[in-house]
UniProtKB/Swiss-Prot annotation:
Encoding gene, per UniProt annotation: CKB1
Description of post-translational modifications: Phosphorylated by alpha subunit.
Assembly behavior: Tetramer composed of two alpha chains, one beta chain and one beta' chain.
Family membership: Belongs to the casein kinase 2 subunit beta family.
Stretch list, region Disordered: 66-90, 269-294
Positions with biased composition (Low complexity): 70-87
Cited InterPro entries: Casein_kin_II_reg-sub_N, Casein_kinase_II_beta-like, Casein_kinase_II_reg-sub
Compositional bias ranges of the Acidic residues kind: 273-288
Role of this protein: Regulatory subunit of casein kinase II/CK2. As part of the kinase complex regulates the basal catalytic activity of the alpha subunit a constitutively active serine/threonine-protein kinase that phosphorylates a large number of substrates containing acidic residues C-terminal to the phosphorylated serine or threonine.
Protein name per its UniProtKB record: Casein kinase II subunit beta
Alphabetic keyword roster: Phosphoprotein
GO BP, one annotated term: DNA damage response
GO cellular component term of the entry, any: UTP-C complex
Domain of life assignment: Eukaryota
Length: 294
């Protein structure tokens, strides 16, 4: 007995996440995508945004190839379309299938970066982290600490995905080349820090490893003598893996974090004020031109 075509149908999001090398992704819920607030600002970053969004949501989208096929229909059907009030878009305004697929994947990646910093998305990514889907840190003293995907920038097209270790605070290139085509912006810069703060057990795992190996830090030696850090060949990244031990150091770290957050807030506020001033200047120039023309 033949199977129902609807039962065999696989949603677009599921197909994308099951592609080779796409197992870092989680499936974004349709409710999240259909909320316009979650898509704010993405229309300017993705070509054929509307068509790409419809593709992700499994709506039928007309492409340039479909338009060329429709041109072979009879004049009778065209007359019926005009009587029914439907209109055909010009072929030059429609994306081809390859461009539409690229735009849909780009849009999904940018939505994915926003989804994984939501409560639902963090929970889904935490499950993958717990299963070690992202791999383990290659550093010996991290004792197989699970890695977290991260992007060095939130702008797509700049750099591919990297893996962050919360234990040594360093980043690594994925060991398999199949992940080197995944854009880092699809995970963003915020996700790793938010995941660590939302799930304190990750910091507890790091603390156990740090305590375990704190007395056995490896250092290069020549004939039994350690190489001085000020030497040209001395260690350079030891500070990156230092953690506060005394109560005073912990308070100092807390103070530095607060000051950093305050500085970031002030910088963002200053940039917003500058943008408002530029908009006011542009409006004044437009008013002056209007008055001059009158």
């Amino acid at each position: 007995m033949p199977s129902d075509p609807e039962e065999d149908y696989i949603p677009w999001i599921q197909q994308l996440c099951e592609l080779f090398g796409h197992d870092y992704f989680v499936q974004v819920s349709q409710d999240f995508i259909e909320d316009d607030f979650n898509l704010t600002g993405l229309s300017s970053q993705v070509p054929y945004y509307r068509e790409a969004l419809y593709t992700i949501l499994d709506y039928q989208v007309e492409t340039a190839e479909d338009h060329n096929t429709d041109n072979t229909t009879t004049n009778t059907s065209n007359n019926n379309d005009s009587r029914n009030g439907t209109s055909k878009r010009n072929a030059s305004e429609l994306p081809n299938k390859a461009l539409l697929a690229h735009s849909a994947e780009l849009l999904y990646g940018l939505i994915h970066a926003r989804y994984i910093v939501s409560k639902q998305g963090l929970t889904a990514m935490a499950s993958k982290f717990e299963r070690n889907d992202f791999g383990s840190c290659p550093r010996y003293f991290c004792d197989g600490m699970h890695l977290i995907p991260v992007g060095s920038t939130d702008v797509p097209g700049q750099e591919t995905v990297r893996l962050f270790c919360p234990c040594c605070n360093d980043i690594y290139i994925p060991s398999s080349s199949r992940y080197l085509n995944i854009d880092g912006a699809f995970f963003g810069t915020t996700f790793p820090g938010l995941l660590v703060k939302m799930f304190p057990e990750i910091e507890n795992q790091c603390r156990i490893r740090i305590t375990k190996f704190s007395q056995n830090d490896f250092g290069l030696k020549l004939f039994g003598f350690k190489i001085n850090e000020l030497s040209a060949t001395g260690p350079r990244m030891k500070w990156l893996r230092m953690h506060p031990e005394t109560e005073g150091e912990k308070q100092e770290l807390t103070h530095v974090n607060i000051m950093f957050q305050l500085a970031t807030y002030m910088k963002t506020k200053r940039m917003e004020e500058d943008d408002e001033e530029e908009e006011d200047e542009v409006e004044e120039e437009d008013d002056d031109r209007t008055m001059a023309s009158e």
